[in-house]
Amino acid sequence: MNIREILGLTPIIPVLTIADVAQAIPLARALAAGGLKVLEVTLRTQAALPAVEAIRKSVAEVIVGVGTLTRPVDFAGAGRAGAQFGVTPGLTPELAAAARGARFPLLPGVMTPTEVIAARHAGYAALKFFPAQPAGGVALLKALAAPFPDVLFCPTGGITPGSASEYLALPNVLCVGGTWLAPAEMLEQGDWAGIEALARDACALRKS
């Protein structure tokens, strides 16, 4: 499955920071039960890659990717953990080379027109727009549509349940990344029913 196909499966990709690997399986199951079956686990904790491995082994109904890939070596670790896609906050020649050798498709991050051109030159036409809200949000994505009609985006960063629909209404947006689907307090309390409810609400934002 290529990255466009993966992104097309969901309106919202939960962007997850997992501090305790014991949370990984019930979290993935709760999100999937709520209808969100494409997940991004960020490389921001020591538990991230073990969490991805646990989800791959035990929650077959989800597609799980690894985010915050910032060094070429990160691609190897993500591949060993079983990542089904990767996400970077930006794109360098070194990261592009690592991605070509990876066993999974990449969603590279961009913020400016120059970065869109560079990513497209490297062969990417589905891009993470990051950090979406600080970079210009909906207005900038609208401006990018005319010069880049062949490029689709997954905006991530600063998006809320209240603003997600405005992004999803744009023709050049496939889906959005959301950090609100797994609040730290819910993870600590093991409130999987609450997380499932958040996922169900987010799934209802599906593009028309």
Where do the language-model regions lie?
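Conserved N-terminal beta1-alpha1 strand-loop-helix module at the mouth
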Residues: 1-85, 101, 150, 161-162, ...
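Glycine-rich phosphate-binding active-site loops on the catalytic face of alpha/beta enzymes
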Residues: 85, 89-95, 128-138, 172-194
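Shared catalytic-loop signature of beta/alpha-barrel
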Residues: 118, 139-160
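Short beta-strand segments at enzyme active-site cores
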Residues: 39-42, 65, 88, 109, ...
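Mobile acidic interaction elements
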Residues: 135-137, 142, 147, 163, ...
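Histidine/lysine/aspartate-rich catalytic loop segments that bind and position anionic ligands
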Residues: 92-126, 130-135
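Glycine-rich beta-to-alpha transition loops that act as phosphate-gripper elements at the mouths
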Residues: 17-21, 66-72, 88-92, 108-113, ...
